[in-house]
Amino acid sequence: MIRIIKNAIPFLCGVAFFISCNSKSEFLTPVCFDGKYPDESAQDIEIVVSDSGEVNFKIFAPVMNKYEGANSYMDFPEGIIVTSYSNGEKHSVLTADYAISEDRIQRMEASKNVVITDLQKKESIRTEQIIWDKRNKIIYSNVEVVQIKADGTTNRGDGFEADERFTKYSIRNPRGEMLANEF
């Protein structure tokens, strides 16, 4: 009996090996996402960007997805809020419904209902797309923008360019309404 069991064990292992290794891979699918799914994902994130202990920017997003590879990037599919600071005080706030940040080229693009508010001047710019060039420390847009000033007047333009903290900016081809002081 023991001899039968000793001979049966290698036979059963061999049968199991050949049965499990067939040419059809019905149950085995290689895991290769090709960048369609994030390598990392986080919810309710806050990123603090500082220099020498001084906060320059705070970035908040409900969802952040990170994709690794030669052209690694992060996207913020549910929106983003970027607050810039100057001398420890909030200076401006950017909100958008979507954003993508590309590491290699040091560029962030925000799109869909983009609003940048200068908290000191109480002015804002609304547009559908902006690009933050981190290398050159500028923010710009090449699509229509609407500027809303503190007094309620509005100007339109064909884009704008600003420093990355949004302390100085200019609108391309401005047009709109102006309030004249009464004499």
Each PLM stretch: what is its role?
Residues 1-183:
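Mature-chain termini and adjacent capping regions
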